[in-house]
Amino acid sequence: FPNITPIQEKSVKAGLLEGKSLLACAPTASGKTLIATMAIYNTLGKGKAIYLVPLKALGTEKYKEYLNVFKDSPYKVGLATGDVDSESDYLAKYDLLILTTEKLDSLLRHKVSWLAEVKVVIVDEIHLLNDTSRGPTLEIILTLLKNLIKPQIIGLSATIGNPKELAEWLEATLVIDDWRPVELKKGIYAEGR
């Protein structure tokens, strides 16, 4: 892989393709999405994958992205961000599901049978565990997943204040890198200058 980024290389070495759970912390645009895609590709054919997003808009973006990635494959990509208590049996036909946190919470509470087929869960923006409105739901979901179906969990974030503690709680290997494709310029802006 001549163009593999440091966070991607570290993730593969940490067991990404062996089904190990990871917490990948790296700057925006450093290649975290490809880490998710590698884990998904590695799983499909053996089980289902879930890509968990905090917001409908991000879900729609990831859905379009993965529709394109899997357009020439036998795998089906689905999106469910709507009414959390609506009928969900139709979701069983998809191999990769892009879900909001609230939708997955509803599916877990309704004991949807096909969830037992899930082998990997990607948690985008996992730092939102610290968010007072979305964090508690995400924490419950991750706890249920770890205890009920024990999937590989891949947490992705650019900003985590306590990565070691979070990785330990997730039972995941922490992978951190600060490489970024564009140099970060820092400065102070005061009084219009």
Please give the residue ranges for each predicted region.
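Conserved P-loop/Walker A NTP-binding site and adjacent catalytic elements of P-loop NTPases
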Residues: 1-190
